UniProtKB/Swiss-Prot annotation:
Organism: Haemophilus influenzae (strain ATCC 51907 / DSM 11121 / KW20 / Rd)
Protein name stated in the entry: Uncharacterized protein HI_1571
Pfam families named among the record's database cross-references: Portal_Mu (PF06074)
Superkingdom of the source species: Bacteria
Length: 79
């Protein structure tokens, strides 16, 4: 069984019945949230910790949002 299949089962057999009981028995399919697993593989933090300063030191422009995404770290919130 794949994670995609398991997520579909969770959506159909847990989330949908919960919504039908607590919200609306005839809830429109497009309003049903779906469950999914985060299967993204993040980069090795130690490799990036060594490489990023070296690359930026020689003038390579690297987007901060790209680095946050590659490492799987959420961007800091203001405030």
């Amino acid at each position: 069984m794949s994670l995609r299949h398991l997520a579909q089962i969770i959506t159909q057999q847990i989330i949908l019945p919960y919504l039908q009981i607590n919200v609306d028995p005839n809830i429109a399919p497009h309003r049903i949230p779906y469950f999914e697993f985060d299967t993204k593989e993040y980069e090795d933090l130690s490799v990036f910790a060594d490489a990023i300063p070296k690359l930026t030191g020689i003038g390579v422009q690297i987007s901060e949002s790209w680095v946050w995404d590659k490492l799987g770290i959420p961007e800091p919130q203001e405030g």
